[in-house]
UniProtKB/Swiss-Prot annotation:
Heterotetramer of two alpha and two beta chains arranged as a dimer of alpha/beta heterodimers. One of its GO terms (biological process) is protein deglycosylation. This is Putative N(4)-(beta-N-acetylglucosaminyl)-L-asparaginase GG24090. Disulfide bonds join C100-C105, C199-C215, C357-C384. Keywords: Autocatalytic cleavage, Disulfide bond, Hydrolase, Protease, Signal. Cleaves the GlcNAc-Asn bond which joins oligosaccharides to the peptide of asparagine-linked glycoproteins. Residues 1-23 form the signal peptide. It is an enzyme of class 3 (hydrolase). One of its GO terms (cellular component) is lysosome. It comes from Drosophila erecta (Fruit fly). InterPro entries: Ntn_hydrolases_N, Peptidase_T2. One of its GO terms (molecular function) is N4-(beta-N-acetylglucosaminyl)-L-asparaginase activity. Pfam families: Asparaginase_2.
């Protein structure tokens, strides 16, 4: 089942146990639209959404970023192996993300995608337990395909939160994972084409020779600067589904036990050693059984500075519904980065959920829960408008 949820700055999908109606009044400012189960009716000046008044069973649930259907279906099947998904949320998230790694989802998850400046693919991944607040993560993982499973081993077999680089690979070998090349003919061709085009775009600044026309090697500019003025818009990097894409997944059982996880091969043509938001708790994902969870995707270099997943969960802790929480998680970024691109999913512990996006044409995401009308698994889509930085907040 596919639902298109309108065009606006923020389009939010929310399931709830009981509703009457919602009215969103238009104004000269960009407006917020919300969509619920049920039919909508549009009139001049007002968008009225009739909600489903019946009580809907929302849990258990699996929700993930992007149209990664196979990952969601597998996670849902694993979650349902026990009644109500009890004690299966970790297995569901790890196996769901692992499925995407194996399928090389959009070539932005798993091996054979997003080569760095040297042509190598490295992986980042994280698993977070909302009951214990324990986290296992890996970053810059080399020569190991199973990033999310290595992250699980960090969680279950160490007292650390994150392992990185070659040392993370050595840990993976000790845990029984085999080393193998993450480079494929496709990723090699991608890198060769990039170098043939003078390494454009790249992530360097304030260096010489000019990084906008040269591959380097680079050195710092000799003139010291007190503040660097960026002369390259972030949207020049083509951030979106085919770059900076991450699978972020949340699984919740009927007792509101929550796990969240992420996996990615990072930004295409990144400087070697770069780590994005995906393996950072509070940035790529965050989970707390007392509140809910959130996962993010987009420009990780920017997002990790603001911890949007943590902001969304803390907004729900303060009593805000997922729709407002998702906005709040991204609004902080927009204060400083008007050319930012990204999306955020927020889910409360009861299974109510919302998605917010900015700067992309649209943001699809997958949901599996008993609330589906044509089966448990459905695709939902958010349409976004770039270049806007103000929204009207509607009380839900």
């Amino acid at each position: 089942m596919k639902r298109h949820l309108g065009t606006c700055l923020w389009v939010l999908c929310l399931a709830s146990t009981a509703f009457s109606s919602l009215a969103v009044t238009t104004s000269p400012k960009p407006t917020l639209a919300s969509a619920f189960s049920g039919k909508s009716k549009t009139t001049a000046g007002t968008t009225a959404v009739k909600a489903n008044k019946t009580t809907v069973e929302l849990l258990p649930m699996v929700i993930n970023t992007w149209k990664f259907t196979a990952a969601n279906v597998l996670a849902w099947r694993i979650l349902k192996q026990s009644k109500g998904g009890l004690r299966q949320t970790r297995n569901a998230v790890v196996e769901g993300c692992s499925k995407c790694e194996k399928l090389q989802c959009d070539r932005t998850v798993g091996y054979g995608g997003s080569p760095d400046e040297l042509g190598e693919t490295t992986l980042d991944a994280m698993v977070m337990d909302g009951a214990t607040m324990d986290v296992g993560a890996v970053a810059g993982l080399r020569r190991i395909k199973d990033a999310i499973k290595v992250a699980r081993h960090v969680l279950e077999h160490t007292q650390h939160t994150m392992l990185v680089g070659d040392a993370a690979s050595a840990f993976a070998n000790a845990m029984g994972f085999e080393s193998e090349s993450l480079i494929t003919p496709e990723s090699k061709d991608m890198w060769l084409q990039w170098t043939a085009e003078n390494c454009q775009p790249n992530f360097w600044k304030n260096v010489h020779p000019d990084p906008k026309v040269s591959c380097g090697p680079y050195k710092p500019r000799p003139t010291p600067l007190t503040r660097w003025k960026e002369d390259r818009a972030r949207n020049e990097y083509e951030i979106g589904r085919k770059n900076h894409d991450t699978i972020g997944m949340i699984a919740i059982d009927v007792e509101s036990n929550i796990h969240a996880g992420t996996s990615t091969n990072g930004a295409r043509h990144k400087i070697p050693g770069r780590v994005g938001d995906s393996p950072i708790p509070g940035a790529g994902a965050y989970a707390d059984n007392e509140v809910g969870a959130a996962v993010a995707t987009g420009d990780g270099d920017v997002m990790m500075r603001f911890l949007p997943s943590l902001l969304a969960v803390e907004a729900m802790r303060a009593g805000k519904p997922p729709a407002e929480a998702a906005q709040e998680g991204l609004r902080r970024i927009l204060k400083y980065h008007k050319d930012f691109m990204g999306a955020l999913i927020a889910v409360d512990r009861l299974g109510n959920y919302a998605a917010a996006c900015y700067g992309l044409d649209e943001f699809p995401f997958m949901v599996s829960s008993p609330a589906g009308t044509d089966g448990p698994t459905r695709l939902e889509t958010v349409k976004c408008i770039a270049g806007q930085d103000k929204v009207n907040v509607v009380s839900l």
